[in-house]
Amino acid sequence: MASCASIDIEDATQHLRDILKLDRPAGGSNAESQRPSSAYNGDLNGLLVPDPLSSGDGNSTNKPGIRTMPPINLQEKQVICLSGDDSSTCIGILAKEVEIVASSDSSISSKARGSNKVKIQPVAKYDWEQKYYYGNLIAVSNSFLAYAIRAANNGSAMVRVISVSTSERTLLKGFTGSVADLAFAHLNSPQLACLDEAGNLFVWRLALVKGKIQEEILVHIRQPEGTALNHFRRIIWCPFIPEESEDCCEESSPTVALLHEDRAEVWDLDMLRSSHNTWPVDVSQIKQGFIVVKGHSTCLSEGALSPDGTVLATASHDGFVKFWQIYIEGQDEPRCLHEWKPHDGRPLSCLLFCDNHKKQDPEVPFWRFLITGADQNRELKMWCTVSWTCLQTIRFSPDIFSSVSVPPSLKVCLDLSAEYLILSDVQRKVLYVMELLQNQDEGRACFSSISEFLLTHPVLSFGIQVVSRCRLRHTEVLPAEEENDSLGTESSHGAGALESAAGVLIKLFCVHTKALQDVQIRFQPQLNPDVVAPLSTHTAHEDFTFGESRPELGSEGLASAAHGSQPDLRRIVELPAPADFLSLSSETKPELMTPDAFMTPTASLQQISASPSSSSSSSSSSSSSSSSSSSSLTAVSAVSSSSAMDPSLPRPPEELTLSPKLQLDGSLTLNSSSSSLQASPRSLLPGLLPGPADKLISKGPGQVSTAASALSLDLQEVEPLGLPQASPSRTRSPDVISSASTALSQDIPEIASEALSRGFGSSVPEGLIEPNSMASAASALHLLSPRPRQGPELGSQLGLDGGPGDGDRHSTPSLLEAALTQEVATPDSQVWPTAPDITRETCSTLTESPRNGLQEKHKSLAFHRPPYHLLQQRDSQDTSAEQSDHDDEVASLASASGGFGSKIPTPRLPSKDWKTKGSPRTSPKLKRKSKKDDGDSAVGSRLTEHQVAEPPEDWPALIWQQQRELAELWHNQEELLQRLCAQLEGLQSTVTDHVERALETRHEQEQRRLERALAEGQQRGGQLQEQLTQQLSQALSSAVAGRLERSVRDEIKKTVPPCVSRSLEPVAGQLSNSVATKLTAVEGSMKENISKLLKSKNLTDAIARAAADTLQGPMQAAYREAFQSVVLPAFEKSCQAMFQQINDSFRLGTQEYLQQLESHMKSRKAREQEAREPVLAQLRGLVSTLQSATEQMAATVSSSVRAEVQHQLHVAVGSLQESILAQVQRIVKGEVSVALKEQQATVTSSIMQAMRSAAGTPVPSAHLDCQAQQAHILQLLQQGHLNQAFQQALTAADLNLVLYVCETVDPAQVFGQPPCPLSQPVLLSLIQQLASDLGTRSDLKLSYLEEAVMHLDHSDPITRDHMGSVMAQVRQKLFQFLQADPHNSLSKAARRLSLMLHGLVTPSLP
């Protein structure tokens, strides 16, 4: 593999496209190279006669995995202002650049209620901090729910896991810092991966055992200690693509990518588990199973792995998106295949590829469309990865009328089907749902609508669990029983009488600021006729229009089936064939169905195989027409009419919408007056199912012409609709072709072998094929692309007469075939020779491995259950059947409904080949895995070449063997047809029961509806009676109350005043007298009091204070107003004028000064220039004179110095020799004497130490010379032998010698080393001798004592034995030292040392 520096840019770009299958036609070379040439059906269906529905019509090339986009002309710009209520649902997006303005009701401070379309159920209460989390706080699977929390006591990070079915809980711990990201491998996987802020990876396998959650650690990779905490860390699992043959998809990809701040790591978990058994494992100990990708300047934000795990896409805050090719097993470094800036260098926060991971079709390329986001997803862009052009731009902005305009901070997630993009705003309590449409052929994708749903709290993180179809009635979801009942009966009343509508159910688990909630959103998608109508012809899976376009499948629909016309039959061919068994995949190896899968019901087959008159007689009655229509429905759609009409059968959400199979059935009408049209739905079957279906019809030589005529008639009708049309995505752009031609030279042998194999299938003579006929690699590539061949070629290859005019309708030959014919120089020769016998075509393949083919047929029949067996089990299925895959169920029915045909072996396509087979330069890992398959394909190709070259004399035996096989097949076919007749009788009875049950259900519904209407009428009558009673009582009360009031008032006026006046007259006289007397007394007292009060000083002061307080405010206001209105403006004007004058004066003065300064500087510069010229000339002369003198002097000095040096060296060498000899003698003599003295001292000290008593007191050695010992000790210290130096000084029992050592060596040098260099006996002796006399050099002794005591080893037995006595002696000396001089500066250190010794001595006392 070449290094990254030597890669051509065009080569790398084309290599990336080859890996991702971006610009590959529908029949890529890799797909056809995987097809074995030993199977007759495979060669016939894949090479000779491609399915016209899958390759001919451009409208049918869209696959069932992704909803396609109708032809919509987008505007340039659009602004969508959301309203915040339920009317902001499915607002159409009709422009390339769209700005979406958030509603004011979505702000956190708004009091608006949540949306009625959102159902919330709390799961757990916990307070999360409101901020933008770059990773996920929650991970969702079908069985478990995991979310990150913090412990209440210590704040450590944990992950809470909840079982969705039993609500059982458990905790996962052991994280460093917070949990940066967590994710399940896929929805059905029990593997949970967590990544904390330190970069530690945890992978658990969760299981529910006896009602308890059991967690098993699979991988635990630990980062080095001290790794910086960083929240920019992400987990990216390799996408999981479900297989068609898998019932339970719990296996997950072993590849996971980790995004750190400065790098990305891709880990192969299987390799890690095989090489390590115990966890955790440090990352430094792992040598294989991972690869590191570096290439971004700032931290990484998002990433994605291709489904085959060979390409990694990374997005960073530096604005770049880069694609890396990775090989985990090899030694090659990852290389950058492509890079670009999608948002002009702004930080990226989103990288989503629009792949359908729910029902991925092998023909649909991965990574076709890409969604990128920047600035916390405030700007989203849709990209085409073939042309790298922006298709649409969405910008989110805050409400401009809001008081607090907080910019949006959006979290985005794409559902598995790539149909809906869900966004949550961290700064607002709202969820957005955007619908996504794609068109693979035209290379277009866009967002078609946006829906706004208000919540009660902002969503910080969320996980999608289910996005499915549902039925809505008055904006509510139907119950399960009514949902099935209304499916078969709603369309009989027409589109205007519908009570239910197609809806979408989105189930999320959302982390709010206050709680974790289960959120369910139900809404009706956009039903614009301009958008929905083209979907029925572009897509091959469920859509939303079944409520308006679905015909009745009950009795009314069957009754109207006999009044069809010729355009109805033509409309059948426009519908795409179901991709699960009708359409042959041309990009990968086709799904090779057995002949049993093409088996039609006995009623239709007998009518075709017997005679044309039998088909005309079948239209004599209405009942026979109805049964014929029902049987043809079963044959074409592979869905039994019982399962389509039975309202009691449980259906998954995907099956509630009309699939093209039902649309095909519903549009099938028959003409009762024409026998050819009556049989055309059954005779159309060979056109839909090429290959084995034709052999199934032609049972004998006498019936070949009948079947051929029916085939010719149907092909004439189907031919204009099945012509191949060029598609924009099927042709390569010039840059792609040029880059591909350079990369294809190494693959010429493979293409040549494939061309030979296809040449045999196309009956090209061997003489036309030469090794040098392949002119270019592009021609060979075009040969491997699918070339649609129509019905006449099918007839010619099978030995059937296609009728006149069929030979003109054939596809254009490929470039290689044209080159071959030009080299042979036979312009009159035909590309297709005379059609051989059918036995000649099949003998070479059937003789190769007939027994193996029969065994594979039995395996295929064992895998697919018969329809009657499945119908018996459908009623007993529980609600878990709703989770089953609809495509797998239909494929099973398709294979089983035709399971009684012939015994031609058709091995089933391995569903993983389309994922493992890549471009010619795929990774070595994938090449090793597919080595065996390539070998088998090569062997089959060589066998085919050998069979072409065989002489004709071997063919009679092969023909005889083939005839014997055909006889056996015919015999088996008759038996299977009989069994199929019995099966169809049971199916007809089942259909009748289902129709009766549907009618009874409809009758019950109508009866319940009538009862509800009667009850509502009675209720309305009661309400009307109650209203009348209330109105009558109100009228009576108003009338009586007015009259009664007037009469009472009149009576009171006439009676009450006279009586009151008569009774109050004496009382009034008495009161007047008493009041007069009281007033006179009060008047006198009032006058006296008022006079006193007026003369009081307090009153005057109070009045003055009140007046001052009253006038203070107005006066201040008046002065302030006058000052502000009069004084300040006048002062400002005067100051402004003054400053203006000052400014003008200063400016003028500055200008004059500058002018004078410039003139002065110019004159001074001129004078200096004039004075400098003579000085410079003089200096130049002096320099030249100095140089000449210097040269002369240098020569003279060098000669004299050389002579003097030689003389001095001669004299010095002589004297130096004499002095050196004397010095060497003296030094050697001194060193030898010193060495002898040291040796003597060492021997003496050793002897004395050995003879010393155990009391610990050194034996004095008075005979040693003190100076010699100091010299020896100094030498030991210089050599670093500290222990020996202290030991010698202590052994001499001389305190002065010990002080000499202590003064020479710093205590930090002795005790600063991690292991103390002094042994325990030396430490004890040092402590004892230093403490013997603390009167002199107290500071030095105390410092050494403190360090020595701290370095005593209490576990040493010698230390434990002698420490008590030594410490007691030291304490006594310290006590004496403190008593002698208590105010000494060292008393504090001595007291601290005494306390330390007390703690050491006390435990040792008894």
Curated annotation (Swiss-Prot):
* Modification N6-acetyllysine occurs at: 125
The UniProt entry annotates WD repeats at 174-214, 230-277, 295-334, 342-393
Please list the GO biological process terms of this entry.
deadenylation-independent decapping of nuclear-transcribed mRNA
What is its biological role? In the process of mRNA degradation, seems to play a role in mRNA decapping. Component of a complex containing DCP2 and DCP1A which functions in decapping of ARE-containing mRNAs. Promotes complex formation between DCP1A and DCP2. Enhances the catalytic activity of DCP2 (in vitro).
Ranges of biased composition (kind: Polar residues)? 726-744, 823-832, 841-852
Q: Would I find Nucleus among this entry's keywords?
A: yes
Give the disulfide map. none
Q: Where is the composition biased (Low complexity)?
A: 609-631
Describe the protein's quaternary organization and the partners it interacts with.
Part of a decapping complex consisting of DCP1A, DCP2, EDC3, EDC4 and probably DDX6. Part of a complex consisting of DCP1A, EDC3, EDC4 and DDX6. Part of a complex consisting of DCP1B, EDC3, EDC4 and DDX6. Interacts with DCP2. Interacts with RC3H1. Interacts with NBDY. Interacts with Tex19.1 and, probably, Tex19.2. Interacts with LSM14A. Interacts with DDX6.
Q: Which UniProt keywords apply?
A: Acetylation, Coiled coil, Cytoplasm, Nucleus, Phosphoprotein, Repeat, WD repeat
Q: Which organism encodes this protein? A: Mus musculus
Where on the chain is Phosphoserine found, per UniProt? 3, 6, 560, 565, 583, 585, 680, 712, 727, 729, 733, 745, 849, 876, 880, 884, 892, 895, 897, 1385
Against Pfam families, the record matches this protein to: EDC4_C, Ge1_WD40
> What is a single cellular component term in the Gene Ontology annotation?
P-body
Q: Which Gene3D superfamilies match?
A: 6.10.140.270, conserved c-terminal region of ge- 1 (1.10.220.100), YVTN repeat-like/Quinoprotein amine dehydrogenase (2.130.10.10)
Where are the stretches annotated Disordered?
Answer: 604-631, 667-686, 719-744, 782-855, 873-951
Q: Which residues carry this modification: N-acetylalanine?
A: 2
**What name is this protein filed under?**
Enhancer of mRNA-decapping protein 4
In this chain, where does the modification Phosphothreonine occur?
A: 731, 826, 879, 906
* Recorded coiled-coil stretches: 971-1030
* Family designation: Belongs to the WD repeat EDC4 family.
> Could you tell me where this protein is found in the cell?
Cytoplasm, P-body; Nucleus
Task: Give the matching InterPro entries.
Answer: EDC4-like, EDC4_C, EDC4_C_sf, EDC4_WD40, WD40/YVTN_repeat-like_dom_sf, WD40_repeat_dom_sf, WD40_rpt
**Lineage top rank: taxon:** Eukaryota
